[in-house]
Amino acid sequence: MCASVTVPVLHMIKLTAEELMRHEITRAGLLATDGTVQSGIYETCFAGSGIELITPSPEAQAAVMDLTYNGVKAGKLDFDTSGFEKAVNELFDKGAQTLILGCTELPPAFDMYGLDYEHIDPTLVLARAAVLAAGGKLREA
């Protein structure tokens, strides 16, 4: 509950931190747009969670942006993902146990390009929480 409203508020990033904590993740690589990374919102919301966020190097971040804008948003099904995959591998090399897909273009990218890395989709975490908050039930996967 937020102080300024009288209804429950589902906070996507905090819910993501809680989900990672349930899975005993202590180090996660953050894949997101430049603006999201630079804003520090994930770091702020993850404070006190015990989860260390690992962000891409500037070169790797450029590859994330390239995939997002020149691949997914441009609708290029034959986009070369090697730069992005190098960025992802860099995060795992730095100790990430999973990836946070902190941009709504990234889950479709994983599907479009057959990317197979351990990850969490904050939008899906939020959707599940919304269903449960509304009294619904989730299907077993």
Regions found by a protein language model. Give the residues of each.
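Non-catalytic structural scaffold of enzyme domains
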Residues: 1-141
